Amino acid sequence: MTELVFILDRSGSMAGLEADTIGGFNSMIARQKQEAGEALVSTVLFDNESVVIHDRLPLAKVPLMTEKEYFTRGCTALLDAVGGAIHHIGRIHKYARREDVPEKTLFVITTDGYENASRRYNYETVRRMIERQKEKYGWEFLFLGANIDAAKEAARFGIDADRAVNYKCDEEGTALNYEVISEAVCSVRASRPLSADWKKRIDEDVRKRGK
């Protein structure tokens, strides 16, 4: 069993990429449904606020995302989205029977800008939370950022540079993001080590086409 948590930016700066984001996410979920193994899916959409549209749904029951759920507005309360999701999943694991805790947990965080609107969590708190879950429970975190220094920003969250990547925030870059995320999810679900070149295709795209 794998715990999958997707934290997706829907702030105002994502305007124009709604259809690409929805299509990429749905394609990724469709592919994962064809893979072996069980998974629980949580999806958090964030702007000024965080909205949970899937709360630990069995993968087979995850519905298609539509424009009713994914629409752009507001600012970027990224710390609140990440901190809130870690707290929620962590508490469930803490109080669950040992045999009910998924063997693997993967968080995938995407943002096209810097944190600018969180009220509940700060960098220090979230960094400690992430480092604890990584060290104590082996959770994995991937950070995909556009229009920012993704590695530097990820480091403020306690996420290693080899788990962070800059992507080009356009139609092609968004589609590629979800292809690469899907490949990474497949590796984690199959208990294969997530190599440092998981992000190679995104890096190459940015080199070719610029940020």
Question: What do these predicted ranges mean?
Answer:
Residues 1-211:
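Acidic, low-complexity intrinsically disordered regions
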